[in-house]
């Protein structure tokens, strides 16, 4: 289906998460819509190095969240998160219980429990989940947006042979031997037979792409029966896959993936290297800003500069009080000496300086 009308260009966005990631989803959604273009004429295609010609139209973002165990209270807070953007965005929840869970049985049990089973495999089913869409963007929720996502929706238009648009995974930065050592250890932890992987399969995963951000050509998925191909592969090799859906995509469809610039999925480890360039999505691939005491060389994740962007967006969502309540409970439980040790003084000072400066601007403008 063509999702553009003379009045509106629809851009569908998909994410999947459970109740533990609802707060992260709120921050991801708020930051995404804060930077999102509202008209096709406003889209900046420079990150893609493309010059797409689009019809003039207002952009409407239709967000679909596949949820597992997310409470009604959390759902209401997510809906409130979108209220400032209600003129050009909508939110729909899809309960995971409405889907067929049988494909989870194809996975290694430990991997399924660790990575969410159907919550990650669902990205292989987007073409059948959304039969009325020709394309869709899928994002992880451990993210914060610093730029406009709209350009990615049109990334595949100039190459109709490509099935997906994705950013290369961090594995590609490792020497191949070091990568294989890491994967062998990972397989051992999950009791997976490492020898089941061919050299070619390992090379594809090594030079493969990350599922944290992707744009999918759903028409191409349907025309070529790629969903059936993916599920058949899952039946025969699913128990070998340590990162289930990502390994599958890279092992089976690697040649059909368009490489997107790292700006669309900039891993937190590379933040300092790429900021303040055109970072569009910052991805906390290891340490999550909302987790309690995730340490990195003795420091907490909120010590990291990039977490400041996440916090600034959190303060604009209905989940901010939940975050502070949890931090205070942690202090009572003596997991931290004080809230100050969790978010360093400079982060707090910078935030309040930013707020005070904005308040003063408004005051002087009124006077």
Locate the predicted segments by residue.
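Glycosyltransferase catalytic domains, chiefly GT-A lineage
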Residues: 1-367
């Amino acid at each position: 289906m063509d999702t553009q009308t003379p009045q509106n260009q629809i851009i569908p966005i998909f994410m999947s998460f459970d109740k533990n990631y609802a707060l992260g989803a709120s921050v991801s959604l708020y930051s995404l819509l804060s930077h999102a273009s509202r008209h096709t004429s406003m889209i900046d295609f420079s990150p893609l190095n493309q010059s797409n010609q689009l019809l003039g139209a207002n952009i409407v973002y239709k967000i679909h969240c596949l949820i597992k165990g997310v409470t009604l209270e959390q759902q209401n807070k997510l809906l409130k998160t979108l209220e400032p953007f209600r003129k050009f965005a909508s939110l729909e929840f899809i309960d995971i219980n409405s889907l067929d869970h049988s494909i989870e049985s194809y996975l290694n049990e430990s991997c399924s429990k660790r990575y969410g089973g159907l919550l990650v495999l669902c990205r292989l089913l987007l073409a059948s989940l959304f039969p009325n869409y020709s394309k869709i963007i899928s994002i992880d929720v451990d993210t914060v947006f610093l730029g406009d996502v709209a350009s990615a929706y049109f990334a595949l238009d100039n190459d109709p042979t490509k099935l997906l648009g994705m950013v290369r995974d961090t594995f590609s930065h490792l020497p191949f031997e070091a990568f294989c050592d890491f994967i062998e250890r990972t397989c051992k932890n999950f009791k997976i037979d490492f020898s089941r992987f061919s050299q070619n399969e390992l090379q594809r995963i090594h030079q493969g792409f990350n599922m944290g951000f992707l744009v999918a050509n759903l028409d191409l998925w349907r025309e070529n029966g790629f969903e059936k191909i993916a599920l058949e592969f899952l039946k025969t090799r699913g128990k070998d896959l340590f990162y289930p859906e990502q390994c599958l995509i890279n092992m089976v469809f690697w040649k059909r993936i368009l490489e997107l610039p790292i700006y669309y999925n900039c891993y937190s480890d590379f933040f300092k290297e790429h900021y303040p360039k055109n970072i569009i999505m910052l991805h906390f691939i290891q340490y999550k800003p909302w987790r309690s005491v995730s340490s990195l060389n003795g420091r907490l994740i909120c010590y990291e500069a990039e977490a400041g962007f996440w916090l600034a967006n959190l303060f604009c969502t209905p989940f901010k009080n939940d975050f502070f309540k949890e931090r205070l409970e942690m202090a009572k439980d003596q997991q931290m000496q004080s809230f100050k040790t969790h978010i360093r003084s400079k982060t707090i000072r910078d935030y309040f300086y930013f707020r005070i400066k904005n308040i003063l601007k408004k005051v002087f403008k009124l006077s």
